[in-house]
């Protein structure tokens, strides 16, 4: 079977056209007429006085009934309200209605009183209107409203096409993305090159009896470029690209998701060779049988249909299914077996080189200054995803526009990086002089402990400008190189640096504040990881006391207890010991360098922000002064 290339000019898609072009207009006209009729009826009833039948008989005897009409259900007409006060004036007449009672003498009473009366028989048209048309119209309006509600806001979605797939079809001209637009994930691109080559040259693989994976699962934290990679595969292979989110399959009605899966693969077969991309696969691919909630049947039917479609279509049809998720651990095992999503491509956070390449990709089309150093930014943004870096460049462009500059400068990138890391400046948050001084000592305490610790990361900036929601100041440390392993000494130094702010407060004021809350949280987390994960405790041994944490994007610190009570007590004592020892070490460092602590704090209070060069310059000047004065003492 030979695969024919897709046509360049695909016919326009009509999935979104409403089934009846004038349906909305007809419904609106019907509603308007119905409301006008109700309004007229309400006005008529407002002018009619309803009286009891006994009063109606009394008015007949008093000859106050002028005329009346008799229907099967009621009697209505005109009655005299009051006689004219003067001659020549007309009498006051009002409309009335009363319930008809089975009274054989009614006609005689009307004749004797001289009342003009008659009988009214309801027309066949009104009977049909009230018996059939109005109920059908109300039912149709409810049905139409429900159909629009279930449509999810898209034009043309209704109960008539609720089982249609909502996949968006892009052809090679409209994807606009190739592998040149993707950076920072070279290994993932290499894995997907095979898929592209198969779509371009399928005969070479079939001649060797090779089978391309039916499904490729892109796994990685949010923002790492999984969707962009899928578009790049379609752009490189120049084949139609169906894109849909997993949440778009599932609706309120059971069976809709399965119908949409069938419709999606039906469209894909008609456009083969092509790529079907399902974003957020975990929305429909969760493990079956573990949820007890409303809607479980719909999720499971949708998943079952997806399993059937992936294992049922002919492998020579040229349909490649790409999917993305950041929670592979909750996917059903049947999805990951050979024959379905049998290949997993990890799209991890980029390293320093990858971040630099991503920055260069996102900087295309932006006016940049000649002094831009992407390498410096890349080294300083460890842990940033591709989306974070794109946001960083956008923030830099906004800052440059705010300065009314025609180009993006390095200072804009650095300020944008700080804004992303620590939050925007809170210029409206005004601190008292005492609080400002305490914050300065706190931040300088962090910086000095980091500077005099052998394995701590270098200090890049110290600031007492409030940022974000709660930060009154911050000390920015940036690594000099990408690290994949951390030694025990490095971890202990990180704890010691975190304790530096609290130690400085106690040393200067003899009192402590709530400002070290986040520092204590960070230090405790590192200490717990050392004891429970890395076997670095003295008495806890080499056992691993924490269950696996499969969620991507970092370790979950809500540890589950998987040890005896005695072992848990030992772990708590080990953690407490590590924290206390490093707190005392931070105190010792600051006592030995208390002059530096006061001098740097004095400069920080004057300038509010010190960069790495200024910080080092102050310390070097103090060091020179110490050499020139032999009696210089730095002990507290």
Curated annotation (Swiss-Prot):
Cofactor binding annotation: Binds 1 zinc ion per subunit.
An annotated GO BP: proteolysis
Needed cofactors: Zn(2+)
Gene Ontology MF terms in the entry: ATP binding; ATP hydrolysis activity; ATP-dependent peptidase activity; metalloendopeptidase activity; zinc ion binding
Topological domain ranges for the Periplasmic compartment: 40-126
List of catalytic residues: 443
Gene3D superfamilies: 1.10.8.60, 3.30.720.210, P-loop containing nucleotide triphosphate hydrolases, Peptidase M41
An annotated GO cellular component: plasma membrane
Pfam family, one: FtsH_ext
Enzyme class name: hydrolase
Subcellular location as annotated: Cell inner membrane
Binding site for Zn(2+): 442, 446, 519
Membrane topology: Multi-pass membrane protein
Top-level division of the source organism's lineage: Bacteria
Entry keywords, A to Z: ATP-binding, Cell inner membrane, Cell membrane, Hydrolase, Membrane, Metal-binding, Metalloprotease, Nucleotide-binding, Protease, Transmembrane, Transmembrane helix, Zinc
Its EC number(s): 3.4.24.-
Residues noted as binding ATP in the record, renumbered to the chain: 220-227
Task performed by this protein: Acts as a processive, ATP-dependent zinc metallopeptidase for both cytoplasmic and membrane proteins. Plays a role in the quality control of integral membrane proteins.
Subunit comment: Homohexamer.
Membership in a protein family: In the central section; belongs to the AAA ATPase family.
Protein name according to UniProt: ATP-dependent zinc metalloprotease FtsH 1
Species per Swiss-Prot/TrEMBL record: Methylacidiphilum infernorum (isolate V4)
Organism placement in taxonomy: Bacteria, Pseudomonadati, Verrucomicrobiota, Methylacidiphilae, Methylacidiphilales
Gene: ftsH1
